[in-house]
Amino acid sequence: MFTKVLIANRGEIAMRIIRTCSRLGIKTVAVYSEADKDAPHTKAATEAYLIGESRVSESYLNIERIIKTAKKAKADAIHPGYGLLSENSRFAERCKQENIVFIGPSPDIIAKMGSKIEARKAMEAAGVPVVPGVSESLGDIEAACRTASQIGYPVMLKASAGGGGIGMQRVENEEALKKAYEGNKKRAADFFGDGSMYIEKVIEHARHIEVQLLADQHGHTVHLFERDCSVQRRHQKVIEEAPSPFVDDELRMKIGQTAVKAAKAIGYTNAGTIEFIVDQKQNFYFLEMNTRLQVEHPVTEEITGLDLVEQQLRIAAGHTLTFSQKDIQRNGHAIEVRIYAEDPKTFFPSPGTITAFSLPDQKGVRHECAVAKDSTVTPFYDPMIAKMIVKGQTRTEAIEKLETALRDYRVEGIKTNLPLLIQAAATKAFKEGDVTTDFLKQHL
């Protein structure tokens, strides 16, 4: 096992990784920007190093500074967390060049799955169903219009290198496509350095179901069942749960086996997630693969009893999985909500100083958090400030705990999405599990 791990991240995920490393006796190295000089992760780690200015490009996205810091601290591995550099193949390659273990898959797999077009091609080759569409980069606007008319409107215009909803837009007709195409192409080029676009058919009234995978370096791959992430705003998840209320045992087995087959086909290692879109008839289609730990990994941990960060560390250190598929059992129901520092109606970020902060303290409620009273939420980074996870023996029990905990959650000084979460959890549709990716638009 590793002696010292540098965490190339911030916020709650840095705290989460530090917690597992500490339990395993692994020393931790935190990195921080000027804006984060007093952040909790800098105090929780064994060592902490300033890596740059507040701007993310000058700190958490600065590959060479992070590598230099890892060497200075004599870290033998780097955990990228999620977001930031976690799916940057160049970062993984630089770690490899410096003989620092990157806790994740190989650089070539990150690159392949990072290109949504290449990922579609790989899944098609593996016999995994993909959303009807094209697996080639679109050329000019005329080519895009021809392709869309062949598929049939409405279509989803997507950036090949995209993520977090950036460069993605639903278009209803040719006129809308012409308006959207160049803007999204430019946005993708600006954000990701790749303006390649492709088109997929819109699956109406769909659910977003993803499968958590673990794969060691010795050919063993298992799935840890599914998560339902259908409650979204602007193509970003807000509420996630495991298991899905929509997935029956037959679909669970089928979608899990398909995800394992897909991971094996590309030679995947470490923790990963395959996201599927599922229609009303339970047909499922590959959307994308996330080659990192997911924000919503705690709901899987709660129902399986496994520490996914520990498994990542063990796999990266060359250990074999100590369990097989049949050993993994589901227990209970878990729901996660993301607490964002944002206006609950407009979704605009709400930076500022937290003047009061208290977390609900009840059995079956878990908090992943990196803010406190007097913490400053800056405009430089993602507005998610915390996650709350509830677990019950049944979904009904979990929802009851969720509603109670949300009412007891207190954040003052900034706006948050807590009112939205309270409303969502109280709806008849959510309680009945009648949730699609249109849920927030339809019910709130």
From Swiss-Prot:
User: Sorted alphabetically, which InterPro entries does this protein's record hold?
Assistant: ATP-grasp (IPR011761), BC-like_N (IPR005481), Biotin_carboxylation_dom (IPR011764), Biotin_COase_C (IPR005482), CbamoylP_synth_lsu-like_ATP-bd (IPR005479), PreATP-grasp_dom_sf (IPR016185), Rudment_hybrid_motif (IPR011054)
Name the domain of life. Answer: Bacteria
Leading EC class? ligase
Enumerate the residues binding ATP: 116, 158, 164-165, 200-203, 208, 235, 275, 288
Positions binding Mn(2+) 1 in this chain are 275, 288
Cofactors that this protein relies on: Mg(2+); Mn(2+)
Q: Which Gene3D superfamilies match?
A: ATP-grasp fold, B domain
* Domain ATP-grasp stretches: 120-317
User: Which amino acids does the record list as binding Mg(2+) 1?
Assistant: 275, 288
Can you give the residue ranges of the Biotin carboxylation domain? 1-444
Fill in the subunit field for this protein. Answer: Acetyl-CoA carboxylase is a heterohexamer of biotin carboxyl carrier protein, biotin carboxylase and the two subunits of carboxyl transferase in a 2:2 complex.
Q: What does this protein do?
A: This protein is a component of the acetyl coenzyme A carboxylase complex; first, biotin carboxylase catalyzes the carboxylation of the carrier protein and then the transcarboxylase transfers the carboxyl group to form malonyl-CoA.
Name the PANTHER family on file: CARBOXYLASE, PUTATIVE (AFU_ORTHOLOGUE AFUA_5G07570)-RELATED
Name of this chain's protein: Biotin carboxylase 2
Q: What organism does the UniProt record list as the source?
A: Bacillus subtilis (strain 168)
